[in-house]
């Protein structure tokens, strides 16, 4: 006789329901349990002086090797030289570089304005002192050897200033007064007459007057001569100083020497000279300046440097530049030009620069040190956070797979009883 068909005993419902439920629960929490098993315990446990197996957890026990593997993975696949070059190009775009340079220039100007210790002024003063006192003299000494040294500049100064130079009426009057009061006062003229009328000079004048005159003047020269007259004049100038000075003063006034000198000085200009003379004078002036700069220019600039307070000049210069609208408005243009120069340089040498920067930055060692210095608890919390925030689908998938496995077990159990 055939065996009677077995029926499912629904009184044992928990045997059919528990596998899917338990499988889903186990599958859902397996990831968290696995992560905790990788990290726990954080430290080694010793019993009777012997370390308990599997303590500490797998990751704390091999944290240094893990750090090295993470560093190798990142540097080998994520932060490759090509990727770093792309990153550098994005960071060093012209607009960003220009903005950074502009910010630095503005910061420098603000720093100069608020520089109470005058450090910037001292630096600029040192630069100016070295430039004017040391570098410029050597440069001028070399340039002065050229035949055309400052030729155009000296010619321009000569043509536009010296050639057009002419004293005004007031200037000519003051210069004439100075000439008659300081250079040639009556006492100086008197002394010049005395010095001029020596016995030898008087003899020469007298003989020349006798030989070269004719007619009535010859009779006067040979009968009376000039020796006695000139001798008496010299004696009078020596013995009667005050009277001589008064006579000379009256003579200057009667002859209107002051007005004569004023007119001469007022009409004195290079334009009245012949063209050939002016050209020769201009050439002589140029050669004189060149020769002076070549021989004595260094000493002149050195003495000038020693007599100038460069710190005050530098401070005035910096204050003027920091408040100049032209400088402030040109910062953007300067930053743009510098950014373009840097861009052209980076286009050519970026690969070499990145190759040099990578060892300097030691990114791989930074990653290793950072992972090694992170406590196992912090690593565990970080991985759990990533799993919960970014890998939640895997957790849910684990629960679903556990549920499916439990359903298969229930189905197998049901079919095995039939």
Curated annotation (Swiss-Prot):
Cross-referenced Pfam families: DUF445
Entry membrane topology: Multi-pass membrane protein
GO CC field: plasma membrane
Keywords: Cell inner membrane, Cell membrane, Membrane, Transmembrane, Transmembrane helix
Principal location listed in the UniProt entry: membrane
Cellular localisation: Cell inner membrane
Highest taxon above the source species: Bacteria
Membrane-spanning segments: 10-30, 394-414
InterPro entries: DUF445, UCP032178
Family classification: Belongs to the UPF0754 family.
Protein's UniProt name: UPF0754 membrane protein alr5253
Biological source species: Nostoc sp. (strain PCC 7120 / SAG 25.82 / UTEX 2576)
């Amino acid at each position: 006789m055939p065996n009677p068909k077995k029926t499912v005993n629904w009184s044992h419902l928990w045997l059919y329901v528990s596998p899917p439920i338990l499988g889903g629960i186990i599958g859902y929490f397996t990831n968290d349990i696995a992560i905790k098993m990788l990290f726990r315990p954080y430290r080694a446990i010793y019993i009777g002086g012997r370390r308990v197996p599997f303590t500490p957890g797998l990751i704390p026990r091999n944290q240094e090797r893990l750090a090295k593997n993470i560093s190798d993975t990142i540097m080998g696949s994520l932060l490759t030289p090509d990727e770093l070059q792309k990153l550098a190009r994005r960071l060093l775009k012209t607009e960003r570089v220009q903005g950074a340079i502009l910010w630095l220039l503005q910061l420098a100007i603000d720093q100069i304005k608020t520089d109470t210790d005058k450090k910037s002024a001292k630096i600029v003063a040192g630069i100016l002192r070295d430039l004017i006192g040391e570098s410029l003299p050597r440069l001028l000494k070399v340039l002065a050897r050229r035949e055309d040294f400052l030729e155009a500049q000296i010619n321009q100064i000569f043509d536009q200033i010296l050639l057009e130079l002419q004293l005004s009426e007031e200037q000519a009057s003051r210069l004439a007064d100075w000439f008659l009061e300081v250079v040639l006062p009556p006492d100086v003229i008197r002394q010049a007459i005395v010095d001029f009328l020596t016995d030898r000079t008087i003899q020469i004048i007298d003989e020349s007057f006798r030989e070269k005159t004719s007619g009535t003047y010859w009779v006067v020269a040979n009968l009376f001569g000039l020796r006695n007259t000139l001798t008496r004049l010299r004696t009078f100038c020596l013995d009667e100083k005050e009277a001589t000075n008064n006579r000379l003063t009256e003579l200057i006034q009667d002859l209107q020497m002051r007005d004569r000198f004023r007119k001469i000085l007022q009409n004195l200009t290079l334009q009245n000279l012949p063209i050939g003379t002016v050209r020769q004078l201009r050439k002589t002036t140029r050669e004189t300046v060149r020769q002076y700069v070549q021989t004595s220019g260094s000493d002149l600039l050195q003495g000038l440097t020693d007599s100038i307070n460069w710190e005050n000049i530098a401070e005035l210069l910096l204050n003027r530049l920091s408040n100049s609208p032209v400088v402030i408005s040109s910062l953007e243009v300067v930053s743009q030009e510098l950014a373009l120069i840097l861009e052209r340089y980076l286009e050519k040498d970026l690969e070499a620069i990145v190759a040099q920067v990578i060892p300097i930055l030691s990114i791989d060692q930074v990653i290793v040190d950072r992972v090694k210095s992170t406590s196992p608890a912090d690593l565990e919390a970080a991985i759990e956070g990533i799993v919960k925030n970014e890998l939640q689908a895997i957790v849910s998938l684990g629960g679903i797979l556990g549920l499916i496995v439990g359903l298969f077990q229930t189905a197998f159990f049901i079919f095995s009883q039939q």
